[in-house]
Amino acid sequence: MDKKPLNTLISATGLWMSRTGTIHKIKHHEVSRSKIYIEMACGDHLVVNNSRSSRTARALRHHKYRKTCKRCRVSDEDLNKFLTKANEDQTSVKVKVVSAPTRTKKAMPKSVARAPKPLENTEAAQAQPSGSKFSPAIPVSTQESVSVPASVSTSISSISTGATASALVKGNTNPITSMSAPVQASAPALTKSQTDRLEVLLNPKDEISLNSGKPFRELESELLSRRKKDLQQIYAEERENYLGKLEREITRFFVDRGFLEIKSPILIPLEYIERMGIDNDTELSKQIFRVDKNFCLRPMLAPNLYNYLRKLDRALPDPIKIFEIGPCYRKESDGKEHLEEFTMLNFCQMGSGCTRENLESIITDFLNHLGIDFKIVGDSCMVYGDTLDVMHGDLELSSAVVGPIPLDREWGIDKPWIGAGFGLERLLKVKHDFKNIKRAARSESYYNGISTNL
């Protein structure tokens, strides 16, 4: 389908989309050779290029927006027209009106009025037996002056016939008066864009059904009011970001249990990736954010922790216990449960006491501390071989390993060890019952799971 220019799109909807995703009502606009002069209902004026590929043109074609201008007072009718793709996709049908051949009429004096045609067979109609079909008499002049579309005429005929028959069975001599009053039309069904907008505003604690039949604007207004109150309450009381708060809570948990906190570089040599067994033929290699031919953003915390274990083994007593919390980066294609920028927790212990039982005990204490249900199942992965997966339902929270493993030799490690890695965003998703992991991530669109596009 051809991309329509901006003037065609705003003429079809009567609306304007700002750079911030705000819908405005257009009061007046003029189109020159390459420019459009627009006056909004709120009083704002602007001059824009009549482009097919501008941000506003794309937004109008995709029928998406963030909010409406309060001063423009965009009506529900205008909003539904904008959100319904039919106004752009429907093909128009040209109707050719053909007039009937005119008959020559005799001229009549202006002073003489045309008398209505008398009803025919009135007496015969009144004398009909009760078993015959009832047909209310309609003046011929009325029949000639009222034009009804065929579809409407058919439905009216079927309704009146059914009502007439029902009334005659019940003995009602005036079946027209027995017809019930028309039923009030319910609110139109929500479009996909409207549903997506409301789901962004919904929180797990909201007991609001999107199938309640309420108009979109009423549902949106109620949810916007709730989200603003939620943000105001956070600003007045807690003032803590969920991700930062969880990081501090985890840090305190492991420090209290004798683990040393590590903060290692985010930019690492590509050589580390190769030493982890990730070559160019593996799937994980395609997910690496390469900075240049020598460095990349770390996709995991393990390489730096391997180096710390080897170096600290020369100075610290047995066993060595360390942990790190920090951002990692991968080019992920599945956005439902994965993020390209995510926060990892890795903890490991090297030396004595590195058994599966001890590893499961640390994991159990940790998740019980956070109040998260889980189960541990066996699995395997490309990097570490056999692993223990920590699951919450169908969601993987962690992969845990009991060493030594063959990969250790690449990093100069020759002692037994245990360790596990957790994604903090997944822990928050489970802890707060978020439907979308992006609500728990570093984001400008959400704060503590609350949409900021208000």
Swiss-Prot record:
The keyword Cytoplasm applies. One of its GO terms (molecular function) is ATP binding. InterPro entries: aa-tRNA-synth_II, aa-tRNA-synth_II/BPL/LPL, Phenylalanyl-tRNA_Synthase, Pyrrolysyl-tRNA_ligase, Pyrrolysyl-tRNA_ligase_C, Pyrrolysyl-tRNA_ligase_N. It is an enzyme of class 6 (ligase). Signal peptide: none annotated. One of its GO terms (biological process) is tRNA aminoacylation for protein translation. One of its GO terms (cellular component) is cytoplasm. Residues 102-138 are annotated as: Disordered. NCBIfam families: PRK09537.1 (NF007083), PylS_Cterm (TIGR02367), PylS_Nterm (TIGR03912). Catalyzes the attachment of pyrrolysine to tRNA(Pyl). Pyrrolysine is a lysine derivative encoded by the termination codon UAG. This is Pyrrolysine--tRNA ligase.
